From Swiss-Prot:
Its EC number is 2.7.7.23, 2.3.1.157. GO terms for biological process: cell morphogenesis; cell wall organization; lipid A biosynthetic process; peptidoglycan biosynthetic process; regulation of cell shape; UDP-N-acetylglucosamine biosynthetic process. The keyword Acyltransferase applies. The gene is glmU. Acetyl-CoA binds at residues 387, 393-394, 412, 430, 447. It comes from Solibacter usitatus (strain Ellin6076). One of its GO terms (molecular function) is magnesium ion binding. In the N-terminal section; belongs to the N-acetylglucosamine-1-phosphate uridyltransferase family. This is Bifunctional protein GlmU. Binds 1 Mg(2+) ion per subunit.
Amino acid sequence: MEVMPQPLTIVILAAGLGTRMKSRHAKVLHQAGGKTLLQHVIDTALELAPAERIFVVVGHQAEKVRQSVTTPGIGFIEQTEQKGTGHAVLIGRHALAGLDGHLMVLYGDCPLLRTETLRRLIAQAAEGPAAGVLLSAMMDDPYGYGRVIRDSRGHVLDVVEQKSGTPEQLAIKEANMGIYCFRAGLFWEHVGEIEPNNPAGEYYLTDMPAILHRAGHTVEAMRIDDPAEALGINDRAQLAEVDRIFRDRKRRAVMAAGVTLIQPETITIDPAAEIGQDSIIESFAQILGKTKIGENCRVGSCSIVSDSTLADEVHIGAFTIVTTSVLEHGVHAGPYARLRMENHVEAGAHIGNFVELKKTRMGKGAKANHLAYLGDSEIGARVNIGAGTITCNYDGFKKHRTGIGEGAFVGSNSTLVAPIDIGEGAYVAAGSVITNPVPPDALALGRARQEIKEEWAKKRRKLAKT
């Protein structure tokens, strides 16, 4: 049975710029798997400790990093000079030293760490006498990683960095992953002994195992099977690889829950998205943000559904974009439709090809099957919107509302100049420009009367020849 130390304090190191990213943005602000690298690590930490026991060390672009964190209650410690990982923790001593229990150190650019792995690390730290436990992995090529030096009993004596190791030490395949869980009291007692004895003049947290060993304490290492789990991101290629891993994890979880993905490797599903059983997501679709999709739905190829809610049996045709909208049971949208923002489409309604909705409510069974723009509108149940209909909702200064009552029929190529209301059961003749309210059950015609001029074309052609 796992033993979880209580309480646990977590420090996340996120002060670096990440020069190899070749970016104007701090490294931890880059996104993989639908969230910033830092937010991934924070979300993992929240599975282990309350927000008030989680602290982020910030440095480069400190204010932007603070603002990027979506979790209330997280503490921040500013490292104005980046002098190494040991220094990053040491400057938080006044804020953290009074917190007993265990202290875990994580990195803001290591988003792939699983909660289960960290629980095992914490349990090992709690069960035994060790002053600290570090995470390690066996690697075929550990170049660039610190090597874990053990004694005959398997205890950690030291972590030797690539630049300072002897050939014998560098031949060791066990690499330090840089994740630690210390007994807080012993850590704060000895962390001040770290010295900048390296060409960079920095204070390295990797010195702590040797310091604790010299003080007569035991340090252990817990090996993980997959080194990629603790992969830190240093450049764009690694960022892309981590994003791929996140996407693959999510796709596998979705399929395990009963969702069919057609060509799954082409599909993007964000971590917070939810998809119901027996739904089908076609190739190259993107399910983004906090989208919730019900059961027996289908999302067509190359469609994008973002921060929206789809009830059961909703069908999204290919190349359709749905943003911050609600689609009730049995709605059909697309192909090539756009539900731009804040729309609510009631049960059984149809939004056809090349139809755009913006801040519009469509009633039950309403239909706009072809080539229409409906903005800032309230459309009643069973309304039929003909092809080419547009609501003229903007007068150059303000947006205006269009209301269409239940059972109304709007003919093709109609222009509805808002603000305007069309009553229940009313008809709008095709080609009309409607500028005044239409009473219920009335017929509105707003077009020029057709005129026929016999033989006009024949005379025009004859004239052109002269």
